[in-house]
């Protein structure tokens, strides 16, 4: 177990003394960012229950073209696990294709049985009832020729399913790179134009080609990208919406960036590079050129200088590690252009450099945060020929 730092202990004590019910959106977001899902839900358990007044929130989670990796990430969220978190937030997970037991039952092309046994009937009933949060995992094929028939579940395309589900949703959250902007399924290939995989609100960086736009549905979408998305990003975003700390649509312009990502987790002015555990090697201009080393991974294709996410602060796997710490270069899976913008994944982007600088001189000129902290010292030492 990782021991809590003195600063974090002091911050936790400060937050514990605050009135949860009187927190504005800004204070709430600072609290969830600092504490993480585990500590936040634990610290404010009683207050959360009081705030909810036992009002149940329905959650419908549908799957398009994907690997279910984001659901698996959520299930590996640690303590509290997803079941405990949903219980504390008083969420009724009404539908999730991986976790629910119902199966689609058909007879001569017609749905049979009841919603207790038949997931297709259950979904139709839930759509009619409305008043739910919709989570979408996976991309939506528009091909061939706008039919959406590259993904058909039962006798319905997923494109149709999304349209029906989105129509009566109180809030829509796209989870994972595929649902946000197409992800792996929309990568450049010989068949990409034919399949035409899209995200809920974007296709790569193009909001005009999001599937909701194609369907003529004008509703805001919160994007939680990643391949997979971090469990904290998912749980805390849902928690903020459920608790009314992010009001839709009023608070979204201030809370989200231009691609619909919560600025709290995907800060426009911060990159994974700035808090990378290998940052010290970068500042000294020391780079690994083979896998298995301990130095900066830039020359092995690391994209951390362009990845706007809090991975370096939040960490993964119970807050103990992250890609670069484990020896894997960051592939910037939170970017709308992923994976094409990151390819080739494990080759240095020689024509790009870090923030436009040449990698061979970047440690000497110190960019970004390095110019304010360790980089200033490095520049002075190098200027003296040390």
Curated annotation (Swiss-Prot):
Signal peptide annotation: 1-51
Post-translational modification summary for this protein: Predicted to be exported by the Tat system. The position of the signal peptide cleavage has not been experimentally proven.
GO MF, one annotated term: electron transfer activity
One protein family per Pfam: NiFe_hyd_SSU_C
GO biological process: methanogenesis
Known EC number: 1.12.98.3
Stated induction or repression of this protein's expression: Expressed in methanol-grown cells.
Record: residues binding [4Fe-4S] cluster 2: 273, 276, 296, 302
Keyword Iron-sulfur: yes
Any one of the GO CC terms: [Ni-Fe] hydrogenase complex
Positions contributing to [4Fe-4S] cluster 1 binding: 67, 70, 178, 227
Predominant location: membrane
Top-level class of the enzyme under EC nomenclature: oxidoreductase
Cofactor(s) needed: [4Fe-4S] cluster; [3Fe-4S] cluster
Keywords: 3Fe-4S, 4Fe-4S, Cell membrane, Iron, Iron-sulfur, Membrane, Metal-binding, Methanogenesis, Oxidoreductase, Signal
Function: Part of the F420 non-reducing hydrogenase II complex that catalyzes the reduction of methanophenazine to dihydromethanophenazine.
Similarity remark: Belongs to the [NiFe]/[NiFeSe] hydrogenase small subunit family.
Name of the molecule in the record: F420 non-reducing hydrogenase II small subunit
Organism listed in the record: Methanosarcina mazei (strain ATCC BAA-159 / DSM 3647 / Goe1 / Go1 / JCM 11833 / OCM 88) (Methanosarcina frisia)
Gene: vhtG
